[in-house]
């Protein structure tokens, strides 16, 4: 319930402006988030032709950066981005963020990521790049199984819990992927927490 004001805040990230509502996930360290997202986009190796999925997309931050391209490197972007998150208010923000930033090659759906991926796999859809940033508990078998069925050429997995990330990466490696790069980012200085990015390629 909003007692006063618009019910959201505005922040700028990677040259884009984002609206964040109270129930929407958003990284709290903006400086390091730019480092995190820049590295993730670099790992995706976009050329302007790819269809990318932004799973667990929140307010659409990394998906919209992927759709637009990083400042100074706008040619390295996805042709199309599909975002999914189970928080309806976050998806509302993501759609507004796309509109506000003039991004027309990104669509967002409010649905459980695992169910959505499963549906895409059963419909015979295909992906070139999967960007995933699940909660601390990691992903689940339904999502990972569907991801392997969709067989994107590259998966960029961002995680705030290296333990559950390692578990999920092991599943992906056992099902046709090769771990090519690991890059930690210190999002929370002077704590034992770290954000970690893994890049995987289809063998």
Regions from the PLM with identified roles:
Residues 1-203:
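Rossmann-like S-adenosyl-L-methionine
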């Amino acid at each position: 319930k909003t007692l006063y004001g618009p019910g959201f805040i505005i922040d700028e990230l990677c040259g884009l402006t984002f609206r964040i509502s109270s129930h929407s996930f958003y990284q709290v360290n903006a400086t390091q988030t730019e480092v995190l997202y820049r590295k993730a986009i670099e790992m995706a190796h976009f050329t302007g032709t790819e269809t990318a999925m932004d799973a667990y997309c929140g307010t659409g931050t990394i998906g919209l950066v992927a759709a637009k391209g990083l400042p100074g490197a706008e040619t390295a972007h996805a042709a199309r981005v599909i975002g999914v998150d189970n928080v309806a208010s976050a998806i509302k923000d993501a759609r507004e963020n796309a509109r506000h930033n003039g991004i027309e090659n990104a669509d967002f759906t409010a649905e459980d990521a695992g169910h959505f991926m499963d549906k895409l796999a059963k419909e015979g859809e295909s992906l070139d790049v999967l960007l995933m940033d699940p909660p601390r508990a990691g992903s689940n078998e339904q999502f990972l199984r569907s991801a392997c069925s969709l067989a994107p050429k590259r998966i960029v997995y961002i995680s705030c819990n290296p333990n559950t990330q390692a578990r999920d990466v092991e599943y992906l490696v056992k099902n046709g992927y090769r771990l090519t790069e690991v890059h930690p980012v210190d999002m929370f200085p002077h704590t034992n927490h770290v954000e970690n990015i893994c890049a995987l390629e289809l063998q």
